[in-house]
């Protein structure tokens, strides 16, 4: 008799709770959304598509877009400056995250000492009114990765001003 009472108690309370807990099979957990770019992209260095950035204004400077488009939108791209290249005092509209891959990249903020960065170095360059010159050391070409939330631009502050090296 006692076993029958226990069984009745279990069936009365435990079974409905188990059914309610199981419900319709739906849960409150939301599926994890897949990122927009959910495909593998592999581009060996030998397959990079390098183009001239601005043959008239920046001779020899090359760019290879990795994602986005450096000329019109958010982007990530490799830039290549020829050894000894020097850009005059200028600003950019958007912030840029930069990682040096090869060569010695030299930047001189207006009125401040220059900094020289080698492979593996990183800097965040503010957009807007950050006036600076950019030079690639004469020893070798400079290659660096740039990521930006907006298109690349180079607005010369004074075309007569060039870095003194």
Positions of predicted regions on the chain:
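N-terminal post-signal-peptidase region of extra-cytosolic proteins
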Residues: 60-66, 77-85, 102
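Ligand-binding loop in jelly-roll beta-barrel domains
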Residues: 118, 127-152
């Amino acid at each position: 008799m006692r076993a029958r009472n226990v069984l009745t108690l279990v069936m009365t309370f435990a079974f409905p709770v188990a059914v309610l807990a199981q419900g319709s099979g739906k849960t409150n957990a939301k599926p994890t959304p897949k990122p927009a770019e959910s495909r593998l992209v592999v581009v060996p260095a030998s397959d990079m598509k390098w183009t001239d950035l601005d043959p008239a204004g920046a001779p020899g400077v090359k760019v290879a877009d990795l994602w986005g488009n450096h000329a019109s939108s958010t982007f990530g791209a490799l830039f290549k400056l020829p050894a000894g290249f020097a850009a005059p005092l200028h600003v950019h509209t958007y912030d840029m995250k930069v990682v040096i891959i090869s060569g010695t990249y030299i930047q001189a903020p207006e009125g401040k000492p220059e900094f020289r960065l080698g492979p593996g170095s990183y800097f965040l360059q503010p957009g807007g009114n950050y006036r600076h010159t950019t030079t690639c050391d004469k020893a070798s070409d400079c290659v660096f990765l740039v990521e930006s939330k907006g298109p690349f631009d180079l607005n010369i502050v004074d075309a007569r001003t060039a870095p003194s090296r």
